[in-house]
Amino acid sequence: MPCVQAQYSPSPPGSSYAAQTYSSEYTTEIMNPDYTKLTMDLGSTEITATATTSLPSISTFVEGYSSNYELKPSCVYQMQRPLIKVEEGRAPSYHHHHHHHHHHHHHHQQQHQQPSIPPASSPEDEVLPSTSMYFKQSPPSTPTTPAFPPQAGALWDEALPSAPGCIAPGPLLDPPMKAVPTVAGARFPLFHFKPSPPHPPAPSPAGGHHLGYDPTAAAALSLPLGAAAAAGSQAAALESHPYGLPLAKRAAPLAFPPLGLTPSPTASSLLGESPSLPSPPSRSSSSGEGTCAVCGDNAACQHYGVRTCEGCKGFFKRTVQKNAKYVCLANKNCPVDKRRRNRCQYCRFQKCLSVGMVKEVVRTDSLKGRRGRLPSKPKSPLQQEPSQPSPPSPPICMMNALVRALTDSTPRDLDYSRYCPTDQAAAGTDAEHVQQFYNLLTASIDVSRSWAEKIPGFTDLPKEDQTLLIESAFLELFVLRLSIRSNTAEDKFVFCNGLVLHRLQCLRGFGEWLDSIKDFSLNLQSLNLDIQALACLSALSMITERHGLKEPKRVEELCNKITSSLKDHQSKGQALEPTESKVLGALVELRKICTLGLQRIFYLKLEDLVSPPSIIDKLFLDTLPF
């Protein structure tokens, strides 16, 4: 039997029809080791005659081998003589569009040549070899795919159950290419179609093209050829539109190892999908792709070196641009997720840094946020002063100033040099503990004064009113700042100068007042107030109506501005929960605790172990409620 090597690509003029090579090359692949003879179910996809015009003519595989074949000394496959069984004695016609200048008689022969039919009484009809093909006549039908317009012509229907197998021509490419691994566990072969290169594609109303048969690296059929199997498989990796065709569920042991091909990017998306119209591959999220590294929310792309959501990106950018300083009300290990990311800005910013967000990438110059555009022309002095400022501007400026003032008054470094959680913490005389108590109160007064000067509008008040407000609220500010900074759950108290002391070290000086401060701190931290609410709480504890003010009206206006900024912060949805009622309730509790503080100072004065500083003595007398 002669060795035949058929190539399908554009052929030079004068060559025989069987030796022509077409632009679309054929390749096969053993998709599963359990298959030897595969039957193609082509009825589900309804491939029209136009979609199969690039297939080789049946005359290529007719029984007569005469002179239309070129004999090659070395062939890839040695096939048996194919037998083509045609229903009703008529084979479907194949119309191939020649894209090169071929002889006219070749084109005429392609449209009218009929394959030879073997005798019906031959024994080969009962058991067809593996290289035989069975064609069944089927009427034209309307294609389900809108990309393929309906055309009249013979259609391939499904293969009969009695047919042992249906194969496509094997990959007889020259020169051969290197075989690559196969797709493990694949259930469906992929048929790829691509536009014919010589003629521009004519798009259909649904966006389809005149397509040619082009199986690529992921599209192939199994070709069991018995003992004369090939040692490698070749494929032409071309971009194409995939349309899956199912294989018949007929299995038999293989006589040779399967041929492997490179998996197509769309192979995974076609498994389990409808073979007629596979959907495009979806983005895989198994490796965490598409989630924010900070809070776990949806994230489209990377920001500042890490895949983050828009909320965490904006939070990180604002924090770096404004050089904001945050304070954690808990143990600096607050959970940061989609639901609780706004509760603690300190822990959120620390997590941004821990996941790898780079502060140096944030633009802090005059072009920040403009995405590379040139700065606009400077406005004239008349244009820079708006005739009527927008209402939200003053509250927003007030809120930013309050937060900045609170963070600036927070100690940068903590001093653990005197921290002692053991029983030796109570060492020392009572006078030393009382003196320590007075020193801590005195240091808080200086911090409160520098903090108050950064509040917008406070320095516009009369000097007498400024002094009165600071001195009247010094105990409230002392308790509030101590409650915000301290980790009272572990009995660690952080004072305004950064000194960290254990509860046992403060108990002899503070007395029972220390337990009241601890309870207030735990309740305040349970409210989950953000830094904006804490800043407003600190300001409202000082700027309020006091007896002896010279201009109480101006103090009331400043208090209303702070309250408006808090309401504006809550109305814009920036606060996680309603905060105004919580802030007002915390103010009431703060006043009660300050009364206990006055009682403690009064008791120490009566004890007279240590003379109080003059500033403490004056403040005590001025803040008495009688």
Swiss-Prot record:
Low complexity biased stretches: 268-284, 377-387
Recorded GO CC terms: chromatin; nucleoplasm; nucleus; transcription regulator complex
UniProt-annotated stretches for the region Activation function (AF)-1 domain: 1-108
Extent of Pro residues compositional bias: 140-149, 195-204
Biased composition range(s): Basic residues: 93-110
Annotated stretches, region: Interaction with KAT2B: 379-626
Free-text description of this protein's post-translational modifications in UniProt: Phosphorylated by PRKDC.
Job of this protein: Transcriptional activator that binds to regulatory elements in promoter regions in a cell- and response element (target)-specific manner. Induces gene expression by binding as monomers to the NR4A1 response element (NBRE) 5'-AAAAGGTCA-3' site and as homodimers to the Nur response element (NurRE) site in the promoter of their regulated target genes. Plays a role in the regulation of proliferation, survival and differentiation of many different cell types and also in metabolism and inflammation.
Comment on protein domains: The AF-1 domain mediates transcription activation. The N-terminal region (1-292) directly interacts with the C-terminal LBD (380-627): the interaction is potentiated by AF-1-mediated recruitment of NCOA2.
Subunit: Interacts with SIX3 (via homeobox); differentially regulates the transcriptional activities of NR4A3. Interacts with the constituents of DNA-PK heterotrimer PRKDC, XRCC6 and XRCC5; phosphorylates and prevents NR4A3 ubiquitinylation and degradation. Interacts with NCOA2; potentiates the activity of the NR4A3. Interacts with NCOA1, NCOA3, MED1 and KAT2B. Interacts with EP300 and NCOA2; mediates the recruitment of MED1 in the coactivator complex.
Clinical condition linked: Ewing sarcoma: A highly malignant, metastatic, primitive small round cell tumor of bone and soft tissue that affects children and adolescents. It belongs to the Ewing sarcoma family of tumors, a group of morphologically heterogeneous neoplasms that share the same cytogenetic features. They are considered neural tumors derived from cells of the neural crest. Ewing sarcoma represents the less differentiated form of the tumors. A chromosomal aberration involving NR4A3 is a cause of a form of extraskeletal myxoid chondrosarcomas (EMC). Translocation t(9;17)(q22;q11) with TAF2N.
Family according to the record: Belongs to the nuclear hormone receptor family. NR4 subfamily.
Name of the protein in question: Nuclear receptor subfamily 4 group A member 3
Organism: Homo sapiens (Human)
Gene transcribed to yield this protein: NR4A3
